[in-house]
Amino acid sequence: MATENPIRISGSNERWSNSRKVSVPNRSGSAPPNMEGSFLAVDNLLSRQGGSVYNNLMLPRYGFEEPVTTHPSSKHSLNRIPSPPIYYPTEYQFIDNRVGRFRSNQGLNKVNSPIHLSQGKLSTHKEVSEDESSQQLSVNSVSDRTDGLDIRLSPGSQSLADFRQDDTSSGQTPQHSRSNSSNGEVNTADESGNFSELSDDVVVKDNAASTARASIGNEKSPDESTIISKMKSTNISGPGTAKYPREPRYGQPERQPHQQQNNATWIQGGSNMGSHGVNDAVIGAGQFHYGQPYKFSGDGQPVLQSSGFTPPLLYTATQTAYMTSPAHVYNMQSPAVYSPQYGYGPYTNMIPQFMPGYPSHGSVPVVVSPDFIPQLSGPSAGSVVHGGEMQYAEKLYVPPGQPSFPDPMYMQYCQQSFGQMEPLAPRNHTNAPESQKDDPKFLRQIRGPSNSNMARPGMGVNYYGIQPNMGIMVQYLPTHLGPPLSPGHVPYVEAYPGWQPQGSLEGANGPRLCNFLEELKSGKGRRFDLSDITGHIVEFSADQHGSRFIQQKLENCKPEEKAAVFREILPHACKLMTDVFGNYVIQKFFEYGNSTQRKELADQLMGQIVPLSLQMYGCRVIQKALDVIEPDQRVRLARELDGQVMRCVRDQNGNHVIQKCIENIPADKVGFMLYAFRGQVSSLSMHPYGCRVIQRLLERCSHDHQCRFITEEILESVCVLSKDQYGNYVTQHVLEKGTSEERERIGRKLSGHIVQLSLHKFASNVIEKCLEYGGRVERDLIIKEIAGPDESYNSLLMMMKDQYGNYVVQKIFETCTADQRLTLFSRVRMHASALKKYTYGKHIVSRLEQPSIEENQELRR
């Protein structure tokens, strides 16, 4: 009777495929179905649904196991509850690192592994009770869930010690070795480009011994003690031997942060690991603290490598045996860090070990990382350094934000840089009190004797206080030093004690600039010179205290120092012109620089006059330049505004540049501006910024025949402008700076509306200016219109009670003649009792009751 063996037997040139098409054993039509086949079919359906998860994760699944049950053609009577399946281990059975258990009926993925199995007859099925069968099934299911290399035994299996004989004999080092055998070879290839580290060659020998071990027959089961003893020697775990430690798997990626085998709390007995494996030399690749996984272990518990602390090999084998239940996400909290990432500021959250597989925070020292030392960091070498700016005790300008929690599943895809650790620290970093930092005795007491073996250029030997590179672990990239010219930015430059020009600074974002800036803030910056910050003038110019320091030094410094500062400023002049603090340094150079320096700075403005004129700080630089540069250069700069005059006039910053051009450039040189104002004077006079420009034109160009049209347009609309909140200033300016003819024309224009305008909030100011700057004729017209023809006229009483008109009446008392004053007093005396009831009328009555000596004499007459 032709039947088909449940085990798929491949030839030497065939591959084990991961396809599910051949995963279910096929039976002949003559054999009736049994429960085992049903179970396998259901399991196949379930595994099909879960298979997409494995494919999406793109993780290599090395390993297979084939259940062998009673042969369907066997004449033995079939039992409804079949016996536990018989598993025949291969020489290497790999497991899924993420799931940590075998799944039945799953073949190798892209593995060329010829398996030679004998065609012997299956052993006779021995009927067992349901209790015994369930116990055996439970044992196998428990071993199914164990991590690492899992080999199941059956009564028909031979000694398992030979299964590793070929592999252990080929090499004794913990590395992959390539076999010299001409037999089959298994090339474990990547399924995804993201796992380039996994493309290692694994050699599996296949010889006649393996064929004999895989033969199916009625061989006598070896003694259990023999099996266990040989499994100990090969570190192969089987059912009932999970308590023995497994041999670590070399060459497969570890998926656990910070290489937790370094933590002594993971080893039973609490052995002190602090003195083992400390690398004080240059740390190589794969040993890092704030980095990404570089190596992955085959165990379920993921481990990242720690900062340069490698445990002895004697702990390596026993480490994973005492690990708690596996966690398939990354523990982002390193046991070598003093505060976790969700701690904030100086308040450390020491999280105890609540979750299984997560170590508690130990007091393992942290190797200094150059992620936070700019001259040693990875970005300078072109690599990606993952870390962040640390929270220095002295860098308290801007508190760092809370970093986002990373997704541990994606840590394996991050790139790590080579050799991130740096055992030494920057020199002279202190967190001591300010009063003791400069004390030599205190420094010697804290630092201790120097160590010549650790001396390196620009590096110190000891820390004291808080180590600068120790803090929370963050996932964002560190910032790089550039021209930090944004408002409120705090640049960081290195030390100030013993600075030397050009090259004495170790880095540009160290903590020692804080000390320097604090010295400047406290008023102790006079002991420093510009030569102390040579090479970092731009960074200091963008700081509030640094900018003030440079400005003070530029006023009295030597020409050589000023030239050195100018050479650094000139390439970054355009950026500093728009900086909140840097613009003052540029203005100071325009003011105290020589003619050559002024000309070179003015050349930097060419082509950027319009955008700088519209910028808050750039407009100040242009105004200063127009004050000090040569006349021909002023004209060249002003001509860039042609076509943009009205835009600048209506801008809150640009109008100042237009005013400065009007002040410093002759009218015949800026004819394009006057042409732009023609027909727009009235509207510009009522604009909040345009009214300033019109007033500046009246000051500088009112007597020029080219500017006559400005006055004419103002006089034509003087009544409207007098009532406008901005136009009234233009009208007042004409009364102050204009000619007598212009004042007379304004008086005639306003005649007939004096009382109405005197009660207006803005026009009342114009009437006061008419009384103050107008001639006798204009004043007489105003007084007659207010006083009226006789005493029955009530306009004066109404003005005295008004909040704006009473000021016009008081101005009349100040500017009128004696005869006019007597006439007004006689009118006021008639309404004195009524005026005392009003707030504004009281001022008029009090003035009436305290007349001058001349007035009293005239009143007595």
Swiss-Prot record:
Role noted for this protein: Sequence-specific RNA-binding protein that regulates translation and mRNA stability by binding the 3'-UTR of target mRNAs. Binds the APUM-binding elements (APBEs) in the 3'-UTR mRNA sequence of CLV1, PNH, WUS and FAS2.
Pfam families: PUF
Domain notes: The pumilio repeats mediate the association with RNA by packing together to form a right-handed superhelix that approximates a half donut. The number as well as the specific sequence of the repeats determine the specificity for target mRNAs.
Residue ranges, annotated region (Disordered): 1-34, 105-199, 213-261, 426-454
Domain PUM-HD, first and last residues per copy: 512-852
UniProt superkingdom: Eukaryota
Amino acid composition bias (Polar residues), ranges on this chain: 10-31, 105-122, 134-143, 168-197, 224-238
UniProt xrefs under InterPro entries: ARM-like, ARM-type_fold, PUM-HD, Pumilio_RNA-bd, Pumilio_RNA-bd_rpt
Entry-annotated residues carrying Phosphoserine: S159
Pumilio repeat residue numbers: 532-567, 568-603, 604-639, 640-675, 676-712, 713-748, 749-784, 791-826
Designated name of the protein: Pumilio homolog 6, chloroplastic
Stretch forming the transit peptide: 1-23
Keyword Phosphoprotein: yes
Any one of the GO CC terms: endoplasmic reticulum
Molecular-function GO term, any one: mRNA binding
Location(s) in or outside the cell: Plastid, Chloroplast; Cytoplasm
